[in-house]
Curated annotation (Swiss-Prot):
The gene is minE. One of its GO terms (biological process) is cell division. The keyword Cell cycle applies. This is Cell division topological specificity factor. Keywords: Cell cycle, Cell division. Pfam families: MinE (PF03776). It comes from Burkholderia mallei (strain ATCC 23344). It comes from the Bacteria.
């Protein structure tokens, strides 16, 4: 790592930022009990914004859901990508 990149910082890729955010959300859910998943609409909106940079999609093309069974939580993301 050069001194300039250390001082100025390196720009993280959007995939790395999204991964960090999802890990924080999941960790928060585990520690804080089981509050309602009120962050799902915001997560869906942000996913649409990121994916729209590469593929033309709308809000209707993505579905985000959180299912809970006993001690297992599953965050499911379904994205319909139009054929080119």
């Amino acid at each position: 790592m050069s001194i300039l990149s250390f001082l100025l910082g390196e720009k993280k890729k959007s995939a790395a930022v999204a991964k960090e955010r999802l890990q924080l959300i999941i960790a928060h859910e585990r520690v804080g009990g089981r509050p309602p998943a009120d962050y799902l609409p915001a997560l869906q909106k942000e996913l649409v914004a990121v994916i729209s940079k590469y593929v033309k999609i709308s809000n209707d093309d993505i579905r985000v859901s959180l299912e809970r069974q006993d001690d297992l939580e599953v965050l499911e993301v379904k994205i319909e990508i139009p054929q080119a």
